[in-house]
């Protein structure tokens, strides 16, 4: 999967270039336009088959906020193109899966090529209640391929080498599966009210964290 963005656009679209038979999965509702040799179909966003697969997808959607369906894109010949619009205006980055695997916060997924996939990992009750983004589930990548993650604003990569860092939960986009993490209130309930700081993620170990420069929750509160 090759992808391109138009630097002349303030909030650029992402255009994917596909060869014959190449398959990608995209966030439902993100398609803007595509060439005639590209076909789209809807797939259940869950493993398994039959009724059990449907119930699993819908049930997980109810508690995580994630869509029950995902869009499959297939190019019938070379030079297939499809353009995508992220849910929020901001930077799009590739995460190369294989030796490295990641977890993603809710809303960060844009596209994934056909050789990689993701599952929804059940979080602990404490993480789910404090997290406020993915609910009881967090997206976990597996396999080999490329995943496109989008953010609200610009993205900065933070690298840890047996270190620890605390980050506002609303600014976290993705992080390495090699990192341990917990979600909690900064300095307790009353201190959080006084400082205006809320739920934070503390990461420990060795790996990468991708953070976004803007806070979508804060922006929504201004509207």
For each of these PLM feature ranges, what is it?
Residues 1-223:
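Phosphate/adenylate-binding glycine loop and adjacent helical scaffold
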């Amino acid at each position: 999967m090759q992808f391109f963005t138009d630097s002349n656009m303030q909030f650029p679209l992402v255009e994917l270039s596909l060869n014959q038979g190449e398959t990608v999965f995209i966030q439902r509702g993100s398609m803007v336009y595509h060439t005639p040799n590209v076909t789209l179909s809807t797939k259940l966003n869950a493993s398994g088959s039959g009724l059990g697969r449907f119930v699993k997808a819908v049930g997980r959607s109810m508690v995580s906020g994630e869509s029950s369906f995902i869009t499959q894109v297939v190019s019938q010949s070379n030079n297939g193109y499809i353009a995508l619009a992220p849910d929020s205006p901001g930077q799009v980055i590739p995460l190369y899966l294989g030796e490295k695997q990641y977890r993603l916060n809710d809303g960060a997924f844009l596209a994934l090529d056909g050789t990689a996939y993701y599952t929804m990992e059940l979080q602990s009750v404490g993480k789910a209640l404090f997290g406020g983004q993915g609910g009881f589930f967090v997206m976990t990548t597996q396999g080999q391929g490329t995943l496109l993650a989008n953010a609200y604003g610009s993205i900065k990569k933070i690298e840890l080498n047996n270190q620890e860092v605390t980050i506002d939960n609303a600014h976290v986009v993705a992080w390495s599966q090699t990192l341990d993490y917990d979600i909690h209130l900064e300095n307790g309930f009353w201190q959080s009210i006084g400082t205006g700081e809320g739920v934070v993620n503390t990461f420990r170990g060795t790996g990468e964290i991708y953070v976004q420069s803007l806070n979508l929750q804060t922006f929504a509160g201004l509207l």
